[in-house]
């Protein structure tokens, strides 16, 4: 997810996306532990997306 796409989302949508990414990260960690994860780069992508969302949320909070 690109920063431009994130900035176009509303606060509620950002929070929903963050929750879904956290759930996905949780599942990916279990797959990694059990040896079922094929695309290990997805872990990094999801973590980066969560960080981008948190940054955008904080920026919105400071701009208010």
UniProtKB/Swiss-Prot annotation:
GO terms for cellular component: cytosolic large ribosomal subunit. InterPro entries: Ribosomal_protein_uL29, Ribosomal_uL29, Ribosomal_uL29_CS, Ribosomal_uL29_sf. GO terms for biological process: translation. Keywords: Ribonucleoprotein, Ribosomal protein. GO terms for molecular function: structural constituent of ribosome. Belongs to the universal ribosomal protein uL29 family. HAMAP family: Ribosomal_uL29. This is Large ribosomal subunit protein uL29. It comes from Levilactobacillus brevis (strain ATCC 367 / BCRC 12310 / CIP 105137 / JCM 1170 / LMG 11437 / NCIMB 947 / NCTC 947).
């Amino acid at each position: 997810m690109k920063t431009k796409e994130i900035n176009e989302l509303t606060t509620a949508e950002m929070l929903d996306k963050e929750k879904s990414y956290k759930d996905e990260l949780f599942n990916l960690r279990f797959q990694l532990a059990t040896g079922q994860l094929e695309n290990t780069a997805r872990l990094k992508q999801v973590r980066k997306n969560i960080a981008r969302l948190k940054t955008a949320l904080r920026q919105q909070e400071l701009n208010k």
